[in-house]
Amino acid sequence: MSQIENQWEQIKHIETGIMRHMLALGLDWNDEVAMARLARECKTFSAAHAQAVYASGDRTRKTRAELFAMVSIMIKTMEEAANENRDVHGGDVWKAFAKHLYS
């Protein structure tokens, strides 16, 4: 498998994880208000927040933390592809969320 095919597969896999976590949280990626709220929360989420979440044992908070980790991995994967002049992008779920993340 070529590098570009591997990056496409990674992005599809990450986006599937993001979608599953959104579904588990009862979030609709077509809901602009919910996606904007989620993006604001994601922008301020830190390693200290993650430690507190995992210490709490709260499954819903853990699911959110995992979602934010996947968002970070998605961004990193896309940055690596861009640095190699490769054109990769997420699908509908990623686009619905990312437009709020970057605004």
Task: Go through the PLM ranges and name each one.
Residues 1, 22, 38, 86-87:
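Intrinsically disordered, low-complexity regions enriched in Ser/Pro/Gly/Gln/His and often acidic
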Residues 66-103:
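Amphipathic alpha-helical binding modules
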